């Protein structure tokens, strides 16, 4: 079997939230919150710390649940109820938080294979056949990390680890690639390399949701921007109209000057 991006899998919107209320422990995070992420639309969710971005990701991954009431609903890929393992087969998630979840002796290949089960390692009850292993090798080749497959994950550079987490997210050909602050902790060289890879994937048809508080890691291929602040959508629409000095100054409560060059954005003190 040859690994390839299936551009035609998504039949429904990625997520549809209607008038939801969400608590984390005893703290109400979302109240009467609504949002829809559409199929095939590369989207950035941008906001300061504490805006609700992480909560939104946890809803997408079903790590959190809404308060059930008559007027609220949540649908993921058109369905209200999911088997958790089946849902996560539709998603590929890359987050810098995952890097510390793997044991010190985990090899690069094992990190990639764990993507078939959306687990933080491989376990005895998990079965991997020759097709799984071949797909893992193909994705590692695509990302240029095949020669690191037998190295311990803990000994790799941050940039190398992030590429293996990307391979883990892609190996099962998910319908949506979710990037949670993907360049956090990377130096400039690794950051630019990583963004180039993401751009290539989007040009191949990968549907991306990017969650960040940095405008500089928003690739040109992103078309929609959603601004979150204090767990509310304060702006939503075409990226070029949303990512302006005026809107981002209001979002981050300080004067900001936005510069755009070669399709990328840069934020400077206003």
What are these regions, as identified by a protein language model?
Residues 15, 29-32:
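Conserved structural motif at the start of ABC-family nucleotide-binding domains
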Residues 113, 128-148:
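Conserved ABC ATPase "signature" region
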Residues 177-181:
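Catalytic Walker B motif of ABC-type/P-loop ATPase nucleotide-binding domains
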Residues 212-213:
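H-loop/switch region of ABC-family ATPase nucleotide-binding domains
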Residues 225-238:
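H-loop (His-switch) and adjacent beta-strand-loop-beta switch element
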Residues 249-270:
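ABC ATPase nucleotide-binding domains
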């Amino acid at each position: 079997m040859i690994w390839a991006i299936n551009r035609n899998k998504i039949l429904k919107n990625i997520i549809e939230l209607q008038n939801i209320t969400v608590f984390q422990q005893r703290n109400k995070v979302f109240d009467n919150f609504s949002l829809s992420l559409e199929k095939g639309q590369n989207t950035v969710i941008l906001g300061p710390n504490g805006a609700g971005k992480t909560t939104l990701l946890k809803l997408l991954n079903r790590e959190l649940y809404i308060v059930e009431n008559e007027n609220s609903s949540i649908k993921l890929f058109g369905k209200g109820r999911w088997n958790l393992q089946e849902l996560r087969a539709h998603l590929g998630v890359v987050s810098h938080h995952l890097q510390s979840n793997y044991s010190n002796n985990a090899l690069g290949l094992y990190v990639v294979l764990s993507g078939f089960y959306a687990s933080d390692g491989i376990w005895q009850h998990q079965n991997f056949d020759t097709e799984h292993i071949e797909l893992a090798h193909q994705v590692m080749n695509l990302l240029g990390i095949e020669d690191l497959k037998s190295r311990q994950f803990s000994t790799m550079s941050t940039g190398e680890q992030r590429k293996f987490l990307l391979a883990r997210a892609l190996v099962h050909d998910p319908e949506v690639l979710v990037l949670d602050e993907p360049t956090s902790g990377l130096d400039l060289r690794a950051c630019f390399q990583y963004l180039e890879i993401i751009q290539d994937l989007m040009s191949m048809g990968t549907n991306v949701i990017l969650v960040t508080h940095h405008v500089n890691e928003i690739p040109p291929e992103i078309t929609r921007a959603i601004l979150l602040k204090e767990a509310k959508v304060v702006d939503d629409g075409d990226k070029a109209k949303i990512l302006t000095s005026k809107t981002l100054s209001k979002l981050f409560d300080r004067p900001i000057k936005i510069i755009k060059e070669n399709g990328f954005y840069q934020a400077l003190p206003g």
